[in-house]
Design a protein with these regions (language model features):
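Non-catalytic signal-transmission and effector/linker regions of two-component phosphorelay proteins
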Residues: 1-11, 48
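Conserved acidic carboxylate
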Residues: 14
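Two-component/phosphorelay signaling modules centered on CheY-like receiver
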Residues: 17-35
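Acidic, metal-coordinating helix/loop segments flanking the phosphotransfer/catalytic sites
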Residues: 35-53
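His-Asp phosphorelay/catalytic-motif detector in bacterial-type signaling
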Residues: 7, 50-52, 76-82
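Active-site residues of response regulator receiver
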Residues: 57
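Receiver (REC) domain active-site loop signature in two-component systems and cognate sites
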Residues: 60
Length: 83
């Protein structure tokens, strides 16, 4: 696929399935979407294929959105990604 016409990828991180469904319905036609239900899963996805934007839930079990954001911003490879 031509990189100029390829839709940007957004990573959506939320532990609530209903929220993920809404985001898919709202953004799915304009963007390529990736989903993670935990902070650990989000960090693994970002490492594998960095998105253009991360939409991050704050209140999640095990690792809060604040902790995920802090780890992303401490890493030179991901510090530039808008959260």
């Amino acid at each position: 696929m031509d990189l100029i016409t390829e839709r940007p990828r957004i990573l959506i991180v939320d532990d609530e399935p209903a929220n993920l469904k809404v985001m898919r319905e709202v953004l799915g036609n304009q963007y390529r979407l990736s989903f993670a239900k935990s902070g650990d899963a989000a960090l693994a996805l970002v490492e594998k294929e960095p998105p253009k934007l991360i939409l991050l839930d704050i209140m999640m079990p095990n690792m809060s959105g604040f902790e995920v954001c802090q780890l992303l911003k401490q890493n030179p490879a991901t510090e530039h990604i808008p959260v």
